[in-house]
């Protein structure tokens, strides 16, 4: 199993604050300039459409949400305080009090109406944002997403008071939703000023600590300059941030010279959290897969390190359904706190295969004629080169270790999604991505009746655990319920985690203050160089 140096940037930032107290430098000149290299490119900085780590990283600098995620957790940003009220009908009302000195880059005031407009726009079917579901906990979301944006439970009580009603309790609402790139405010005048407003020097307006300058047409380079009139300008350490977007191979060459390299790091790099988890789904309605022992055996014989290696260097064996980088309600990393649910160690693989054979015996499936009685077992997957290679590896290991024959069914993206979402499969490979940083983003999917429960799983005990977790007012209790829910789900082996995608990064030795959201996006405004 790979032994990478893992780093939650939040912890990294905290650990190095002591060094900061000993002495700080302003960099190589009077102006503090941060040099950053990221993999990928940027096609938009419109919060409703920014989906890649590079795009969301720029959004985090050009806009301010109600709160901002930092090394100390969620801290006030566009809002300076909020109140939360539990209503008699089970809903919750959050009242955010916006700071009066919040400004757009055109000098106008940031108001509650800007947030109302942005959130309604995000969920509107006309916008067709891939991030719309991040507001699914807001009252009226279903009606709003169906075509009536004004049904969304948000309104401006006055210019500086933004009110949100949630249909149910949502413990991660402030920390994960109100800090996200997707839910940033946008100015209606700017958005409606012209198509492609977010890429237009003429029409773009942001309210963040930085503004973009230089050549806006260059998708491989972005220069960000501190907004001197930003309310928090004194706390923004980097006066200028220069971000170059490169391929992984090219970016890796900058490790050690650039202040931060994100998405590539070379042999000595650190790996941080991303939001992607690859899983094998076993349809609960497939009668030939109804024996728990069979499903557990299929999981045990999978060499997850080898499976991850099939996909590339940025993939690692999954230790659970919730990947590294995802936080608990208490702000710690869920995986670090709860440990591995799945044994991926190379030195125990032989024992796991022996255990799998014992399970096959218990299921009455050791004899060839018994396996034949299962009929055709088909594995559905997208016919990309990487997923095809993974499917072939699984097919081979199940045949060699269990004697189980599996037929491969590779489909184009559209056909694959139709079959997956309709439950027309026995086995299926898929990837899960979270819209917000909370374990429930991976665990809510498998509640009975959830439209994303493609494996058609029904477990009453699991449903109860998830309901109790959602209603819990104790962060510690909620984390415990989610831990139990993950264990229960994986023990039934209808959802089998295979790999997680991680993000390599390298910080120059004298750099501190860089913060990751745990899902691939970064904030460099607090970047500082420690005096050597």
Write out the residue ranges for each language-model feature.
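N-terminal lobe/hinge region of extracytoplasmic solute-binding protein
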Residues: 37-89, 205
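Aromatic- and charge-enriched surface segment that lines or borders ligand/interaction sites
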Residues: 81-134, 163, 288-290
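Structural transition elements
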Residues: 315-363, 384-388
